[in-house]
């Protein structure tokens, strides 16, 4: 198994898979772990090229989804719930569309059928390869969090920004290129399993309008 993963919670409980956003690791879910493990077996993993998961060159959205299926197979999990944020949410949409038999339901947060635009992602991939992660880490707190949240939970902000700063530049760039090519706008209407859609009013990238499109 190429994915680094962590499994927490009571054996025999329903399994929920958590998928991280671009530039973070499965540690991003730590604040939710106590609440979720009260009722679920929680499976977290580091996405391709993130955290302790190795990078294997070019990656696509389909491969990100297939990684999840391979992980479920590796752990002999026939069916699970899934929750992903941003890139992890887009992965969840792919899974709901192309592997519905493996999931009871999917929750997607701060995501879209098409996140951003191709030129922006390709430009970001070039930038991190040339200049390192500092080029995207600068200003990340302002992009990711509202003023009120930064004041209320500075430790969460610091932890996630630390994950971004210490991400592998090539792994990050490869996922940027995957997002540049990923477009499920013509596919989400075919999703037949329940999907919970969560959006943030202050999110400038994956907007409420993007969430409404998924409806």
Residue ranges and their predicted role:
Residues 1-17, 37-40, 78:
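Alpha/beta-hydrolase fold catalytic core
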Residues 27-34, 43-83:
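Active-site loop/oxyanion-hole signature of alpha/beta-hydrolase fold enzymes
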Residues 90-98, 102-137, 144, 152:
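Flexible "cap/lid" loop of the alpha/beta hydrolase fold
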Residues 204-210:
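Conserved alpha/beta-hydrolase "acid-adjacent" motif
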Residues 116-119, 130-190:
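Conserved alpha/beta-hydrolase catalytic His-Asp/Glu region
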